[in-house]
Amino acid sequence: MPELPEVQHTADSLGIQIAGARIARVERLDWTRMVETPSPDEFIRLLTGRQVRGWDRRAKWILLFLDDGWTLALHLRMSGSLTVHPAEAQPDKHTHLALRLEDGRQIFFLDPRKFGRARLLDSAGLAALDAAHGDEPLSDAFTVERLASLLRNRKRAIKPLLLDQSVIAGIGNIYADEALWRARIHPLRPAADLSAAEVAALHDGIRAALRQALANGGSTLRDYRNSYGAGGTNQEHFNAYDREGRPCPRCGATIIKTVVAQRGTHYCPACQAIPSATTNRRE
């Protein structure tokens, strides 16, 4: 699933290309379950003729700000991508939403697994989407102290907590593994048991893993492409994720893959060992 870096690159590469453009019509919507709100018919009616005024990202949602206070929110889920094409381009069978711009260009929402979602939101709907998600981990407000407050008194294992979009927004399986590796924290550690030093290391690890991925254009393992059709290279720089059976870049121990909260999880058993029960509680 595209995570914060991939969604950010998609939002930026799409927004740069279509800012100021007007949506002439919805050319294709052949998987109506993609549209969460409003009804598919209303979605088509309200979207027609709207101008793209700007763009942003919230959590793993791409936000296209339209005129008259509407926002088109798009979620790529597992296999989605958004690309811009010339007028004569023909969508393939996996393109379930196609928008025709007034200048003739087209926006294709390609989604082989049909998990992608679209919402057309008014100001109240946008506020609700924002409120449903937690802290943005690259924002100035996401300090070490803020992370400590989010983890305090939470007995959940740290990895599923990092994946909880209502707590911290935008982190998925890849960057949870990478952040925990950087911080030398076992993915099953209870969040509340992390020491102050470990919380600081995790804060640094989260931001470093995400910033590295942004600098490398995101991670392309299977489907991810930005809106120019280009993949990322961050997968060439993984330290733990997708490295089962390979040596840890830091200590040389063999990276292990296990399952945590029903998610494949990669970690180093030496660097990320679980410490004794009473030595690491936060002061």
Swiss-Prot record:
Involved in base excision repair of DNA damaged by oxidation or by mutagenic agents. Acts as a DNA glycosylase that recognizes and removes damaged bases. Has a preference for oxidized purines, such as 7,8-dihydro-8-oxoguanine (8-oxoG). Has AP (apurinic/apyrimidinic) lyase activity and introduces nicks in the DNA strand. Cleaves the DNA backbone by beta-delta elimination to generate a single-strand break at the site of the removed base with both 3'- and 5'-phosphates. HAMAP family: Fapy_DNA_glycosyl (MF_00103). The keyword Lyase applies. It comes from the Bacteria. It catalyses: Hydrolysis of DNA containing ring-opened 7-methylguanine residues, releasing 2,6-diamino-4-hydroxy-5-(N-methyl)formamidopyrimidine; 2'-deoxyribonucleotide-(2'-deoxyribose 5'-phosphate)-2'-deoxyribonucleotide-DNA = a 3'-end 2'-deoxyribonucleotide-(2,3-dehydro-2,3-deoxyribose 5'-phosphate)-DNA + a 5'-end 5'-phospho-2'-deoxyribonucleoside-DNA + H(+). Monomer. A zinc finger (FPG-type) spans 239-273. The gene is mutM. Belongs to the FPG family. PROSITE patterns: FPG_CAT, ZF_FPG_1, ZF_FPG_2. Its EC number is 3.2.2.23, 4.2.99.18. Binds 1 zinc ion per subunit. DNA binds at H94, R113, R154. This is Formamidopyrimidine-DNA glycosylase. GO terms for molecular function: 8-oxo-7,8-dihydroguanine DNA N-glycosylase activity; class I DNA-(apurinic or apyrimidinic site) endonuclease activity; damaged DNA binding; zinc ion binding. The active site is at P2, E3, K60, R263. GO terms for biological process: base-excision repair. Its cofactor is Zn(2+). The lineage of its organism: Bacteria, Bacillati, Chloroflexota, Chloroflexia, Chloroflexales.
